[in-house]
Amino acid sequence: MKNAISLFSKHKNLLYNNGMITFDSLTLKAFVEENQEFLQDARIQKIQQPTRRDFIFQIRKNGDTRKLYININPQFHHVCFMSKQSENRRRIEIPQKPPMFCMLLRKYLENSRICKINQPQYERILEIFVETYNEIGEKIYLCLAIELMGKHSNVILYNDDTNVILGCAHNVGAEKSQVREMAGTLPYTYPPKQNKTDILTYNGIIDYANLSKDFYWFSKSFSELVMGEPLEKLKEYVALTNLSPVISNNYKKYCLFSSLLTDSIPQKTVNEMIDDYYSYYQEKDKFVNLQTHLLTLTHQKKKRTANSIAKMQSQIDRESNCDKYRLYGDLIMANLYNNSDYTDKITLFDYENNQNITVELDATKTLKENANKFYKQYNKGKTSRQKLGEMVEELLQTKSYLEQIEYSLNKAKTYEDLLEIKPELVEEQNPKPSKRNTNAPEKIEKGEFTIYIGKNNRQNDYIVSKLAKDDDLWFHTKDCAGSHVLLKGDKPENSLILECAQLAKEYSSASKSSKVGVIYTKRKYLKKPPKANLGYVTYSHEQEIILD
C-alpha cells in the first residue's frame, strides 16, 4: 500500500506542482472574444455530465456542431470546444443515469437559444445567457454562470430576471462560505471584488514583483513571462493585441503570445491551445489514477497471498509431527502380546532412536484399537500436509503472477497498457465489449530474425501460445518478474542469443541488478499447466546466461 501511495503522490506532484499552470482570466477573455460570433444565436442541442466536475454541451449553429466542454475540477478547471482527439484523451464516459443537476440543465437549457455570452469584468466567470420557454409556454431568460476559480469552481443556473438560483453543480452552505452561499432559491451574487487596478487605465510605475497582486488579468504564471516588459507592452497584452497562442515543448506552460515563450508549439486558435494543454494533463491524470488503483489492488492481493502462504506453512510445520503417530502404531503392533489392553499408557523401546518412549493411550480401547487410532491420525496428517503443500505451491505461483502484474503496471506507458492489465485484477460485471484491439507485443527486426517482447501477462501468453513455433527460442530472467522474449528464426548466432538475453534482463525487475541469470530454451520445451495463470509456463532443457 505504501508503495502505491508514494507512487500516487510522486506523479501528482509532477502533474500539479512541476509546471502545469491554471486557467486565468486573460485566457478566458481571449476565448470569449474568439468564440463570441459562433455562440451568439447558437442553440444548445444536448447536455451531458460525465462526472460531478465536467459537462458537455452540444451546440449547433448554421450546420456547425461543436462540443463545449466545461471542467470545474480544482486542478483542471477550464472551458473549451473539444476536438475528437482531445475527447479521446480525456477518456470521457457518459453514465447511463444522468445526475440530478444534469437533468435540471436538460430541462431548462436543451433547445434553448444563446442570446449572448459575457465575462464579468476581470472575473474567471463565463456567463451564457439563453432564451427559452417554461412549462406554460412563456418566454424566460436564464443564465448559466461557469465559475472557473480553482477549488471554488462551480456551474450555476439562475433566472436572469429574478436573479434566483435554480440549481448548482455544488451547493455552498454557510459552513463552507460565510461570504457567498450557493443553492437553489438563493439569489446569485458575484464573488467579492478584489482590490486591484486595471492596467489599461494605469500610468504609474510597475512593481514587477507584485504584478499579479496589484493588477487584474495578471496571473502568477503570466506575470513571470512578462517580467520587465514596459507598461505599454503590458497594456497591449491585456488588450489581446497580436494574439499568437503557443504551448511550450515540455507542456509546462501555455501563452497567448509566442514572443513570450520560446521553444514552443504554435496553436491555430486560443481554443486549440486550451483544449490541447488541459487534455494533455487530464490524460496523464487518468493514467496515474488507474495505475495507482491497479497497483494498490496488486499490493493488497500480494499481502493476502503472503499471509495465506505463511499460515499454511505454519500448518504444514505442525502436521510434520504426524510421523510420530505412525511410529507409535508400529511399536504398539510389534508389542501386542507383551502388554495388557485397557491401560492409559505404555512404555516401549524405539529401535530407530535407541531409547524407551512412553505413549499415552485411551484406557477404554485395546492396544490394537489404540494403534489403529494412531495410524488414522498419521494418515490424516499426511493427507493434510500433502494438500497444504499443493495449496502453497499454487499460492507461490499466484505470488509470482502478481509480481509479474506489478512489474507490468510499473512499466506501462499508456492508458491502453493499463486497460489490458486491468481484467487480470478486476472482474467487471457485464463488461462492455472492448473497442480497442489488444496491444501488440514489442517487435524488433534483426535481418532474418524477429524478436518479440511481451509487456504484460496477456502479451506473454500470446507470444508463447500463438506466435512461437517449436524451435523458436524463449528467454526469461530466472526467479524474478519480467517480459517473455521470443526469438523467431533458424540457427541464430551466439551474439543474437546474447542480445535477446540482454533484452530479457532489461525488461525485468532485475534490470539494474548485477549477476542476473537469464534462462532460455526452445518453445517445444515449454508447458502451460492446466488452469495456470496467464503467461505462466514451466520449462525444461534450459540453458542459463549470467549477465552483469
Please give the residue ranges for each predicted region.
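Extended, highly charged segments
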Residues: A4-D548
